[in-house]
Amino acid sequence: MFQQIIFQIAIKHFQLILLLLFFVSTAMAEKVKVRIFSQNAISSVTVSFDLGQYSVYANDTVLVEAAIGEGVSMTLKPSGGKVSISSDGYFYGSFSKVRFMANDTACILCLNPSNVKQRTYEGDLIVTATKQNTLLLINDVEFETYIAGVVQSEIYGNLTDIFRVQAIISRTWAMKNLHKHKKDGYNFCDHVHCQAYLNRCVRPDIMLGTMQSSGVTIVDSTGSLIETPFHSNSGGQTANSEDVWRNALPYLRSVDDTFSLAMRQSDWTKTFTVEKWLGYFSKTHKLNTSNDSIRFQLLSFEQPRRRARILGVPLTKVRMDLQLKSTFFSVSYDSVSGKVTLNGHGYGHGVGLSQEGTIRMAQLGIAYDSIIRHYYSGALLHFNHDSPKNYVENYIQQIEQIIEDDKQRTTQVKSKKDDWLGRLFRIRDREEREEVYDETKQDIESDWQFKFGETDTTDTIKNATPAE
């Protein structure tokens, strides 16, 4: 009976899944255009040929054929809305668009801007001039080659499963946001506005992890690609999506994340003068910091569990304005020195996958798919290379695993709840018990994501006879 129910769930979404299979397989065969050096004003770049043979097109005409070993390098500069090209003292002219087109499967260009550290990229290079008299550089590259470059730029480590996880979430994001910069004439930029893509991938272990996950994305129960945000370190607890952005998404729920503790970015501190700290809330958020209650709360704010606001002020706004590593911090005040210290945890927005948590989980031997499910609640892996039959079987197995995980989580919740109730019962004084209950109930509910019934609230807690 259970298997039949699961199979019916899979069949219900099967047509959607087949459409997704076709879409993903089609898109992944294509190239993507990525704007590189997007954070820099490039006034000049020298291009040399590291591997393979290239045809250099000026507008739509072949200007020169160049290959590795020929010692050819070309310098490009903006000139009156066009791109000028010169090489070894010879001036080729100025053109609306210049394209370095790869003629071999493996072709690599070395780009050396005048004001930025050089990089190497595979595939084609398209160069145009901007209205600001700078160069716009676009790498036209195979999708999976791009993903490998993103993985190398976004995460550290030395285990294949680390790179497999990052490749899957980066691929999912790229597929879902394929037209993010459509109006600009390319797919993605190379910065965190999209995903970091700061060089071609040169590490074999990253290439292996990307290849082993080729075609794999993350979907929800309808077969739709999910949002896959990630951050450096959660500080021990990830954040709900609605606490950072606008929408509450069922797969972006806050989870305990002990794997992120004791890592490079797990803790931080930042100090302010009391005048600057209180002045920020007074000037920016119009709080009356001369009020004793408000002042006390601002100087003794605590977050044993993640919270979204401090006195109604979104912590995301505080983080941005004061350039904090995260919103997960507590406040202490030294009246002698007049210093306010923020003791913080984690690095980044806190939603979705923690990269350092992923690293630790992989080090402990936890499989890549379990890592993904830990951070994206109820998510399913979509294997593009599967046949329809294998895909449905895999889909069913994943749903069964999610149900089993939910059973285990329910058991853990009941155990924790019973332990918590037991500790309350040991408080002999009824008023003290009610006070402790009111103080801890919200955190317990948030932690275990359940609501107490009226019986628990009225009969079990407040009217219980304390244990001897």
Question: PLM features: what roles do these ranges have?
Answer:
Residues 2-6, 15, 21, 26-468:
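Conserved, single-site charged/polar hotspot
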